[in-house]
Amino acid sequence: MSLAARALLPFTLAAALGAQTATMPKSPSAAAPTNPGRGAQSGPAAAPATPKRAEVLRGAYGPFRANNDLLSYGLEVRVDPVAKTIAGKNAVRFRMLTAGTRIQLDLTEDLAVDKILLHGAELKYTREAGAVFVEFPETLKVGQTVAIDFFFSGKPVSKGRFGGMSFEKDAAGRPWIFTADEDDGCEIWFPCKDQWKDEPQEGMTLSVAVPDGLMDVSNGRFEGSKSLGDGYTQWNWRVHYPINSYDVALNIGDYQHFGETYKGLSLDFYALPEDLNKAKVQFAQAKGMLDAFTHYFGPYPFAKDGYKLVQVPYAGMEHQSAVAYGNQFENGYLKRDWTGVGISPRFDFIIIHESGHEWFGNSITAADRSDMWIHEGWTTYLETLYVEYRWGKDDALKYISGLVPKVRNRTPILTEPGVAAEPPQDMYFKGALMIATLRSMLDDDARWFRLLRQFYDRFAYTTTSTDAVIAWWKAALGPVLKFDLTPFFNQYLRRTAIPALELNFDEADGLVMYKWQAEEPGFTMPVEVGSPGHWVTIRPTREWKWMQTSIPKSDFQVRTYLFFVNVSKT
């Protein structure tokens, strides 16, 4: 989701590098730092808190998760807007990877486990925090496919930045119900395997019963609705692709539908009656978004399910094939210039950012929450690519320059794996600026865009890790740049501060000494210095080097709009 939906962060040295988020930040960020350099100055990092047991139970890929591979969900629910309750079952299919008699599923303690059935017989289970440990009477064998029916019910408790599962009303007083659970997980409203690492490989079905007169819009392809004869109508959807747990969504309201086919892809849009005309104008931007992102990364990844935009009462969320939209049918982000440089008012930030997650976050998914920069850093960079596709590279550099003040440099982007905790917002802005810096180091746009496509194709429809992403880019760029990129990635992802180029001038002799101030041993990267029309590439290390220059100290520049670094002159 976008930070803007959360609150986005900026870029440091390179005042104009290149791109912004993927999922948005959930709420506007705190006031940007006044430091005009490369983001806020880093301070001492706080000692990491000991993870709570519940965070580990939810976040760790423990033995009773790792012993099975999720195949599909068949989710059937009934939602009561008056009682504010949900009830139903999830048919969970999985294949055993190691023999065992227990698996772990997840359901918030706020909801009841009514029963869990295997071939009609009740299974025993135990609960701890949100974990549900399901016990089988006989050992399940390696390769065995198992299907259980998990029945549940209760009154969901709204929580998290987006509400989890919330029962609201629209301006006309009609029920407006939604799920948004990236923070607290799918377990907040239905039983699931609440792990990004394992997606249902065969997809899922959703059958959602709501009072007559309301509509449910969920993920996947619409397969029809039917009256249940008791005042309820069931809306049926099928997801044809793997889907990460927090992307599964309900959107229930008095929706009006319109749509079209665009270059063979079905586009479906859902808005409240009073906003229908505004939606028909604003949602037309989806076609320009698709033009841009398919240009760089190839076809829309979920063509069998189609692309949808669904109006919601919060900023937005990247629900797979059913992108949630709440940006008030205005350009920018919630009626403001998101990056403060005059570019974002040209487009609807939520449509671009949240849809960008279809490629990075939904098709390519981080296996662990600690690797979430793969979603947010890359999607933020996609914002910049959208600007470049529409208005050119100069405007893209201007746009990314607005990210710099959003970077905080307080804690590393990468957090402890196996813990259900949100990484810092620097994963958006600092992540995007790091990616833009890679492009500047390569200094070959044609090759860069070929590599972007190859990178996406390699990881599409997979869950992956930071280590795998780094390994790919090391192999792709190392032979060209002729240095090991490991320290580069470690400095930006695993360290708090960004590198600072120290410059020491001896103007009498026309000399300047230079080196990198960086925590990471072995850190090096090229950077361009000089003055307009007289740029040269230098290759500093953590040891002093020198060069001759006729440029006065006051005029000597570092191209920080291309390279995300700080600069210190003495």
Predicted segments, located by residue:
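N-terminal, polar/Ser/Thr-rich
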Residues: 20-87, 172-178, 486-487
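Surface-exposed beta-strand/loop patches in extracellular or lumenal glycoproteins
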Residues: 89-110, 191-211, 467, 471, ...
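Amphipathic alpha-helical substructures
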Residues: 98, 301, 424-512
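Beta-strand-rich binding/interaction modules
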Residues: 113-118, 217, 447, 481-486, ...
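Extended, low-hydrophobicity, Ser/Thr/Pro/Gly-biased non-transmembrane segments
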Residues: 149-255, 560-565
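Juxtacatalytic substrate-recognition/specificity segment
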Residues: 179, 206, 233, 254-358, ...
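Acidic/His/Gly-enriched intrinsically disordered linker/tail segments
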Residues: 240, 372, 376-441
